[in-house]
C-alpha cells in the first residue's frame, strides 16, 4: 500500500489506485474500515483500536496517546494462592501517582478507573486485570488496555518486567532495586500484622516503581519502532516517587481500620434502634 501512495487513512479513496486494481474485490472492506477508524479516532474511541488492532500493533496507540495513558500495577497478598486479594494498586499518569491501599481507599479504584482514557500494564491481561475484575466484581474492564508484555515479545524482549528493564538499561532507585513480588507480600504482612509503617511505604513505593518503569519501557518501545513526535519526557520520572508520603505514626493499621468500621456500624444500628423506640 505504501508503494501505491497510501500512508494514512485519508489516502484511502472509494476506489483502489491503479497499482492495487487486483484488490478490487475486497477494496470496499478496506475503505469502510478506514472510514470507521477515522471516525473512532476523531471521537476518541480508543476501545475500537484495542478491539481491532492486533496486539503486536497496539504500540501505535501509545504513540498517539502516550500523554493520555495511565500505567497500572497491583500487589496481592500472595503470588500462588487462589484466594489471595489485592493489597495495593498504583496508577501513574506520567505526572502524578494515584495510590489505593486495602482497608484505606482501595474501594475507590473502580470509580477512578472510569475516569481513564487508556491503561497500560505488564502481563495485565493474565494477572492484574482478572484480579481487579474479581476483587471489585466487575464484568469487564471499562477502559481500553495495552499489555506491554506482548509488545515487548514482538520486539524479541521476553521475561518479567525486571528482565526487560535490564535489557533496556532501565535502572530503579537503589533502595528498591532488589525488591520483588515476594517481598511485596512480606511487606504487606508486616504492615497489616505489625503496624510497620516503613513496610507500608516501601510496599507502595515498590508498586509505584513498577508503574514508572512501564512508562519508561513504553518509551523504549516507541524508539524501537522509530516513532517520531513522541510527547516530551518531563525530566526524571523516578522523581514521582517523592510524592509518596513519609510514614505517619498516627495511621491506623488495616486491622484497626476494620475494628473502627465495625464499631461505627454497630453504633449506627444502635442509634437507629433507639430512635425507633422513641418514636413508638
Where are these regions (language model features)?
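DEDD superfamily 3′-5′ metal-dependent exonuclease/proofreading module
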Residues: 1-280
Amino acid at each position: 500500500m505504501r508503494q501505491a501512495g497510501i500512508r494514512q487513512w485519508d489516502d484511502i479513496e472509494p476506489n483502489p489506485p491503479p497499482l492495487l486494481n487486483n484488490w478490487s474485490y475486497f477494496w470496499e472492506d478496506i475503505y469502510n474500515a478506514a472510514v470507521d477508524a477515522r471516525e473512532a479516532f476523531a471521537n476518541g474511541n480508543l476501545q475500537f483500536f484495542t478491539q481491532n488492532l492486533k496486539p503486536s500493533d497496539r504500540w501505535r496507540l501509545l504513540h498517539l496517546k502516550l500523554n493520555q495513558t495511565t500505567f497500572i500495577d497491583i500487589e496481592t497478598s500472595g503470588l500462588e494462592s487462589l484466594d489471595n486479594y489485592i493489597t495495593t494498586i498504583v496508577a501513574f499518569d506520567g505526572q502524578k501517582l494515584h495510590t489505593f491501599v486495602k482497608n484505606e481507599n482501595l474501594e475507590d479504584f473502580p470509580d477512578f478507573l472510569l475516569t481513564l482514557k487508556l491503561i497500560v500494564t505488564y502481563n495485565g491481561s493474565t494477572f492484574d486485570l482478572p484480579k481487579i475484575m474479581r476483587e471489585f466484581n466487575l464484568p469487564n474492564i471499562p477502559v481500553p488496555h495495552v499489555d506491554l508484555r506482548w509488545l515487548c515479545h514482538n520486539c524479541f524482549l521476553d521475561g518479567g518486567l525486571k528482565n526487560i528493564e535490564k535489557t533496556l538499561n532501565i535502572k530503579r532507585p537503589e533502595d528498591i532495586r532488589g525488591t520483588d513480588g515476594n517481598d511485596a507480600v512480606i511487606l504487606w504482612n508486616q504492615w497489616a500484622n505489625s503496624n510497620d509503617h516503613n513496610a507500608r511505604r516501601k510496599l507502595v513505593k515498590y508498586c509505584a516503581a513498577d508503574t514508572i518503569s512501564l512508562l519508561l519501557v513504553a518509551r523504549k518501545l516507541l524508539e524501537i519502532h522509530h516513532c517520531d513526535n513522541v510527547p516530551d519526557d518531563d525530566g526524571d520520572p523516578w522523581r514521582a516517587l517523592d510524592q509518596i508520603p513519609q510514614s505517619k505514626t498516627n495511621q491506623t493499621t488495616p486491622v484497626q481500620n476494620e475494628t473502627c468500621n465495625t464499631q461505627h456500624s454497630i453504633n449506627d444500628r444502635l442509634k437507629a434502634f433507639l430512635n425507633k423506640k422513641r418514636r413508638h
